Each structure stands twice: as structure tokens, then as C-alpha cells.
């Protein structure tokens, strides 16, 4: 049994990062990729192991993966992740953290390879069916999909778990067993341990038939993508928001399809039918004077200026002040708002020696900004500049002492304008 079972037609890239948990599936994947590398010396192969910290055996799994990778001469990256509660359940938490770590680890020109197989595909389809998903959700997983500016490949997707076991036994491979895989309280484990064995006992080719249905659903989705491409282009702005006016005259079915595709473009979770109805009724059709907001995990859908926005939830920083004692170096902002820095060359004056520098998120009184006559309150300036309400208390305001100098990327005050060529710019990396 030496013929590779992975789909080598996917492996056009010569730089591969393999997801390696140390379990059966990923061990077979990595082993076959090592053999592929032997046949193609120009291939560069790395592995990544995610330490979730959920199991008391997690540290020993790291050591196992290090031993395997050392034996196979595969550089291994170990990433430790922290699972934050986003309301989606432990399985979704772990997956989100895992794929975020993958994205952060990928090098330019590298593709990600994961070890999902035919039985996984069947489980994914049935879970989507349980949620009442449409063709998009029932498309399950593709062998190739866009990911983090590159590709995510699933070279074993046509193979069954049984064939992977046969490969592993034939080649004397060692792998770890995650005890959580035996807990049928998890939906996927329930399917694998209890439901699918019964279905396969009755219909041995059930997983393959399900995979064919998933492929047909995917084809229908691609056709819809083609048919709706023009509508989608008309609806989406350069900022990635969704214009509401074109949707008003669409049928319910067409509008829902546009909403789904827009959310997919924003990397949002696939919404249920009820969720789409709530987006339309509670956000899109809310009163004109309302500021509607619908939470989805750690993101929100909001409406502003007759557009829908998909944004990350951030707590308001209205009362926050961040001192910036060494303004020549970047400053980290709270609540994951990124960093700011003052760089040479720009329209802001430098702070005087006696002036303390800070970042705040509110400013009292009347403000006089460059390019405007008269004074205005900050709220009025935000409105004139078209700054959405949720950004108004999270946009960094630069102060020298008690004097407002600038709002990052929005305006400069007259008191903050440079008087010579030695000015600086306030750069915000959100």
C-alpha cells in the first residue's frame, strides 16, 4: 500500500502548511505529504499543531507531534490559543481559534492542508441538515477553498476513515487518541459514534451518496453566484457595506440570497432563515430615527445611511484615557482597537516639551477644525464627516495636554495644525 491516496492534483503549490493534531487523520495526511515531498524535492513542507489547553494531555500531545515531525524532518510550529466565550459553544470556539492561528502562521505563497475525509464530509452535511441549512450549507466542504489570502486544501476528502486507518496500520504509524472524541454530548461525535454506524450498516455507501448530494448543492450555489453577480455588484459599496435601496424591490427569495452572499463576503457565519428574517425586519426596516443592532457572536449587523454594516463588536471607550509618555514609539490601544503612532511628515504640529500626550475618545466644548468656519461640538463633526455612531467613541483622539489635536483619519484642529515643515501624522492601525 504505497500509492498515495491523497488528491495530488490539488498540490500545485510547492509550499504547504499541514494542520497536524497528532490524531489518525492528520498523521496520515502528514505522512503522505512527506512521501509526496520525497518525490518532489522542490516542495517545502511545514506542520502546525494547535494547543487548545482543553485536555490534561495537551502538553503530551505537543511532545508526540514534535517527535513525529523530528523523525520526518518537518518543521513544526506549535501555537497556543486561548478560547474566549463568543456565545457559539466550545466546538465553534476551538475551530475559530484554530483557523485564526492557521491564518497567522501561513507564509507568503504557502497553502494550508487539512485532513478532513469522506466521513467528515458526511457529518458536516448532516449537521447542516439538522440546522435547516439551504444549498450553501449543504454544500459542506470543498476540496479547495479560499482562505486567508491563499488556499485551504483537503486532499483526503475523497477517502473514508477506514482507508486512512488501513494506511496507518500498514505503515506502522502512531497517533494520539483525543478522549473528547468519545464524548457523544458533542453533535459531531454523536453522529460518528451512534448515528452513522447504523446508517452505514443499512446503506454501506451512505457517506459517498451524501458527498454526491453535497457536490450537487455546491454546483447549484455556483450557478446562483453567477446569476446574482450583477445584483451583488450593484448592492455592495467600496467599503463592503450593503446598500438597502436595491433590495427593497426584490422578491424575498432573491433578497435573502443577496444577504447570504454579502455575509459570506464578510466571512460571517452562515445565517439561518430566521436570522435573515431578523436582519431584514429588525435592522433594515427599523424606524428611520433608530440605530438598530443585531448581535452575531462577537460581531454585529448595523444600519447607517441606508446601508447594512457587518462590524466587530467593540465596547465604547468614552471614558478611557491612554497616556502616551514616549510619543516617538507606537502606542497600543485598549479593547483590541490596534495601535497608533506619530510618524514624521504631516499636518500635525509636534508636541511641545511641556505638553503631555494622550489618546482619548471624547472631547468637550466647541471644536475648531481645519477647513471649517466656526466651532462645532464633536457629535456634529462626526455627523458631518459621516462617521457611523459605533465608531464615534472608538476613534482615537490625540490630545496634547488638554488640547485636542486630531481625530485619527478624520480631522485636524486649528490648534493642532503644523506651523512649519516639521509636522507629524497620526497613523492608526486598527
From Swiss-Prot:
Major enzyme class: ligase
Catalyzed chemical reaction(s): cytidine(34) in tRNA(Ile2) + L-lysine + ATP = lysidine(34) in tRNA(Ile2) + AMP + diphosphate + H(+)
CDD domains: TilS_N
Pfam families: ATP_bind_3, TilS, TilS_C
GO terms for biological process, alphabetical: tRNA modification
EC number, UniProt record: 6.3.4.19
Domain of life, source organism: Bacteria
GO MF term (any one): tRNA(Ile)-lysidine synthase activity
Subcellular location: Cytoplasm
UniProt entry keywords in alphabetical sequence: ATP-binding, Cytoplasm, Ligase, Nucleotide-binding, tRNA processing
Entry GO CC: cytoplasm
Residues the entry annotates as binding ATP: 21-26
InterPro entries recorded: Lysidine-tRNA-synth_C (IPR012796), Rossmann-like_a/b/a_fold (IPR014729), TilS/TtcA_N (IPR011063), tRNA_Ile_lys_synt (IPR012094), tRNA_Ile_lys_synt_N (IPR012795), tRNA_Ile_lys_synt_subst-bd (IPR015262)
Keyword DNA damage part of the UniProt annotation: no
Main location: cytoplasm
UniProt family annotation: Belongs to the tRNA(Ile)-lysidine synthase family.
Protein task: Ligates lysine onto the cytidine present at position 34 of the AUA codon-specific tRNA(Ile) that contains the anticodon CAU, in an ATP-dependent manner. Cytidine is converted to lysidine, thus changing the amino acid specificity of the tRNA from methionine to isoleucine.
Matches recorded under NCBIfam families: lysidine_TilS_C, lysidine_TilS_N, PRK10660.1
Domain notes: The N-terminal region contains the highly conserved SGGXDS motif, predicted to be a P-loop motif involved in ATP binding.
Name used for this protein in its record: tRNA(Ile)-lysidine synthase
Gene: tilS
Amino acid at each position: 500500500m504505497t500509492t498515495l491516496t491523497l488528491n495530488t492534483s490539488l498540490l500545485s503549490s510547492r509550499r504547504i502548511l499541514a494542520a497536524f493534531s497528532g490524531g489518525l487523520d492528520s498523521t496520515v495526511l502528514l505522512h503522505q505529504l512527506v512521501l509526496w515531498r520525497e518525490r518532489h524535492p522542490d516542495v517545502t513542507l511545514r506542520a502546525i499543531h494547535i494547543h487548545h489547553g482543553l485536555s490534561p494531555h495537551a502538553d503530551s500531545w505537543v511532545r508526540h507531534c514534535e517527535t513525529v515531525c523530528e523523525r520526518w524532518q518537518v518543521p513544526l510550529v506549535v501555537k497556543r490559543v486561548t478560547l474566549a466565550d463568543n456565545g457559539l459553544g466550545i466546538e465553534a470556539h476551538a475551530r475559530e481559534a484554530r483557523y485564526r492561528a492557521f491564518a497567522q502562521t501561513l507564509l507568503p505563497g504557502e497553502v494550508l492542508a487539512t485532513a478532513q475525509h469522506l466521513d467528515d464530509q458526511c457529518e458536516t452535511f448532516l449537521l447542516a441538515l439538522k440546522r435547516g441549512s439551504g444549498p450553501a450549507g449543504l454544500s459542506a466542504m470543498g476540496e479547495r477553498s479560499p482562505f486567508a489570502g491563499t488556499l485551504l486544501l483537503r486532499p483526503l476528502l475523497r477517502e473514508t476513515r477506514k482507508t486512512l486507518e488501513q494506511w496507518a496500520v500498514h505503515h506502522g504509524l502512531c497517533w494520539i487518541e483525543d478522549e473528547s472524541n468519545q464524548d457523544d454530548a458533542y453533535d459531531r461525535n454523536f453522529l460518528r459514534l451512534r448515528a452513522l454506524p447504523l446508517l452505514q450498516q443499512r446503506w454501506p455507501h451512505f457517506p459517498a451518496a451524501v458527498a454526491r448530494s453535497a457536490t450537487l448543492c455546491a454546483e447549484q450555489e455556483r450557478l446562483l453566484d453567477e446569476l446574482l453577480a450583477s445584483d451583488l455588484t450593484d448592492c455592495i459599496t467600496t467599503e463592503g457595506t450593503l446598500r438597502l435601496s436595491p433590495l427593497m424591490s426584490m422578491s424575498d427569495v432573491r433578497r435573502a440570497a443577496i444577504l447570504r452572499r454579502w455575509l459570506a463576503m464578510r466571512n460571517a457565519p452562515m445565517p439561518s432563515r430566521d436570522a435573515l428574517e431578523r436582519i431584514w425586519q429588525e435592522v433594515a426596516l427599523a424606524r428611520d430615527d433608530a440605530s438598530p443592532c443585531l448581535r452575531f457572536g462577537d460581531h454585529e449587523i448595523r444600519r447607517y445611511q441606508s446601508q447594512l454594516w457587518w462590524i466587530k463588536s467593540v465596547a465604547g471607550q468614552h471614558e478611557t484615557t491612554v497616556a502616551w509618555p514616549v510619543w516617538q514609539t507606537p502606542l497600543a490601544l485598549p479593547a483590541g482597537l490596534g495601535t497608533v503612532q506619530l510618524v514624521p511628515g504631516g499636518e500635525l504640529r509636534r508636541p511641545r516639551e511641556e505638553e503631555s500626550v494622550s489618546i482619548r475618545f471624547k472631547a468637550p466644548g466647541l471644536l475648531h477644525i481645519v477647513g471649517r468656519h466656526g466651532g462645532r461640538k464633536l457629535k456634529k463633526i462626526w455627523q458631518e464627516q459621516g462617521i457611523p455612531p459605533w465608531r464615534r467613541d472608538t476613534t482615537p483622539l490625540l490630545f496634547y495636554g488638554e488640547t485636542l489635536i486630531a481625530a485619527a483619519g478624520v480631522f485636524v484642529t486649528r490648534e493642532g495644525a503644523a506651523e512649519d515643515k516639521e509636522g507629524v501624522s497620526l497613523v492608526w492601525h486598527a
